[in-house]
Amino acid sequence: MNVFGIGLPELIVILVVALLIFGPKKLPEIGRSLGKTKRAFEEASREFQDEIKRQTAALEEEQQAKAEAESPREISP
């Protein structure tokens, strides 16, 4: 088992140290807080990416419209 590049023995050591530092009553609360923080970070990241995509699309449309306006149109005789 390899989670985030951390093997099972390392993960067990980390959990034991966390248990010793925070105690069994605080660990669920800390886990919830970390989960909420991770979720909020992912949401903010997703919103940022969506905004970048919207801005890029708007710029591309603007450039395309400008190019179409500047290009000479052929007139049929």
Curated annotation (Swiss-Prot):
Transmembrane stretches, start-end: 3-23
Keywords of the record: Cell inner membrane, Cell membrane, Membrane, Protein transport, Translocation, Transmembrane, Transmembrane helix, Transport
Example GO biological process: protein transport by the Tat complex
Predominant location category: membrane
Annotated compartments: Cell inner membrane
Bias (Basic and acidic residues): 63-77
Superkingdom as given in the UniProt entry: Bacteria
Region (Disordered): 56-77
InterPro entries: TatA/B/E, TatA/E
Membrane topology: Single-pass membrane protein
GO CC annotations, alphabetized: TAT protein transport complex
Biological role: Part of the twin-arginine translocation (Tat) system that transports large folded proteins containing a characteristic twin-arginine motif in their signal peptide across membranes. TatA could form the protein-conducting channel of the Tat system.
Protein name as annotated: Sec-independent protein translocase protein TatA
